[in-house]
Amino acid sequence: MDKNKINELKQHYPKDTRVVLIYMDDEQAPPIGTKGTVIGVDDIGSLLVRWDNGSRLNVLYGIDKVEKIVEK
């Protein structure tokens, strides 16, 4: 992944952004609907998330899916 796309991800998902899991391709994935807090974006574009259930699995760009939680 190029640096421009990684920077876009960092802008779209800044540290402390709340997200909800829509899909994760991993047998040990948190349940769909689990919420978490973004703690960063790594050099390959994976979202580093601290899931509310204690999981630390990363969200893989182009494979897994999360949505930002927009506070109203």
Where are the model-predicted features located?
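Basic/aromatic-rich interaction segments and small domains that mediate binding to polyanionic partners
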Residues: M1-K72
